[in-house]
């Protein structure tokens, strides 16, 4: 869990901004949203398969685009 040290001369807004930045860096909000509902392993594998396919197609597109310029 992120925590910050608030200095005596620091305003609430600055401390809040620091805290939000740490939360965003640690991906806490996205993880909580992902874990909000139970997801069976079959669904997780399905999503991983889809994302792997998207990544592969993107790389293939970039490779073909690069080769066409040569």
From Swiss-Prot:
Coiled coil: none annotated. GO terms for molecular function: structural constituent of ribosome. GO terms for biological process: translation. InterPro entries: Ribosomal_bS21, Ribosomal_bS21_sf. Keywords: Ribonucleoprotein, Ribosomal protein. It comes from the Bacteria. One of its GO terms (cellular component) is ribonucleoprotein complex. Transmembrane segments: none annotated. Belongs to the bacterial ribosomal protein bS21 family. This is Small ribosomal subunit protein bS21. It comes from Campylobacter curvus (strain 525.92).
């Amino acid at each position: 869990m992120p925590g910050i040290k608030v200095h005596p001369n620091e305003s609430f807004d600055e401390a809040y901004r620091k805290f939000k930045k740490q939360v965003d860096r640690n991906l806490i909000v996205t993880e909580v949203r992902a874990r909000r509902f139970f997801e069976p392993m079959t669904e997780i594998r399905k999503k991983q398969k889809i994302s792997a396919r998207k990544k592969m197609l993107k790389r293939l597109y970039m490779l073909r685009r690069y080769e066409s310029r040569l």
